[in-house]
Amino acid sequence: MYSKSWILNALPAPLVPYCELTRVGYLPIGVLVSYLPVLVAILHVAAVARLPYDNILDSCLQWLPLCYVYSAYGCVVDDIADQDLDRKVERCQHRPLVRGAVSTTSACLFAASLASLAVFLTKTFFPDQPAVHIPVALAGSIIYPFLKRFTNFALLYLAFLYVATGLNASRTIGYDILSAPDHLLTSNLLLAAAVFIANVSVETIYMHADLEDDIKSGIGSLAVKIQGYSKPVLFLAAVAYGSLVLASGLAAEFGKWYFTGAITSALTLFTLVARVDLKNGKMCEQFFFMGNAVLMSLLAAGLYGECIA
């Protein structure tokens, strides 16, 4: 998972450690982890409101670089805060701050630059929209790494940030779902709950890659909390996810396109849980990144089908 990608190979050597801090150089698909919940939220509102195609496309394209920058900022902040913990976790000992390739001061300046870029892009793309997600995303990324030191449930907070960003993103296409008729608002909230559970599920799979190191180092995680009965908990989460996406579609009176995407997405999560070996760290990483992308993309595809049907 950590062999150098073509992105890193193409960069001048001094820039490589900074690209590594953002994780994008090693794992380009990682950007989708933050983007797809936003895409799902936008497409849901577009589908229920029957918005013009141009509005949908513009918003989806604008949020892609935004999610990239917010994700990069969060990764840098996480590495700054977790330096002492990363030294104790084998998978993280290659990171630039741990190996001394980037100083803490330089990393802080880099994070500040990314935060400034995120604010600039948000205000440029959506000058007339309330940017509530800006302080939520920026402050939330600072709070999250410290929660891991005090609780096993920091992941729930992270998943909430994804959902909250998606809700605010959906307002940038010119329709306020919070003012929609009750059945449409219900559909949106059910879908948000489903996305929350999906993110918690795949992130928990990912956290099993570091389970032994986390236990030895005293690092909190949901994987640590549910060790010994992880599979039953994840299966329950998969069932809950499937139930919520179906209920959301029924509330919004969606058609075959949505339900095709929703059902295949739910089956994907169930299959991930069934097939993953939680004691195989590499498999946990692969299932997290590829699984997250596939199950959220299927859900987004179903919603897109409703938009153009």
UniProtKB/Swiss-Prot annotation:
GO terms for molecular function: 4-hydroxybenzoate polyprenyltransferase activity. Disruption phenotype: Abolishes the production of Aspernidine A. One of its GO terms (biological process) is ubiquinone biosynthetic process. Pfam families: UbiA. It is found in: Membrane. The keyword Transmembrane helix applies. One of its GO terms (cellular component) is mitochondrial inner membrane. It is an enzyme of class 2 (transferase). The keyword Repeat does not apply. It is a multi-pass membrane protein. InterPro entries: Prenyltransferase, UbiA_prenyltransferase, UbiA_sf. Pathway: Secondary metabolite biosynthesis. Its EC number is 2.5.1.-. Prenyltransferase; part of the gene cluster that mediates the biosynthesis of aspernidine A, a prenylated isoindolinone. The starting point of the biosynthesis of aspernidin A is the production of orsellinaldehyde by the non-reducing polyketide synthase pkfA. Hydroxylation, methylation of one of the phenol groups, and prenylation, presumably catalyzed by the prenyltransferase pkfE, would be needed to yield aspernidine D. Subsequently, the cytochrome P450 monooxygenase pkfB is responsible for hydroxylation of aspernidine D to yield aspernidine E. Belongs to the UbiA prenyltransferase family. This is Prenyltransferase pkfE.
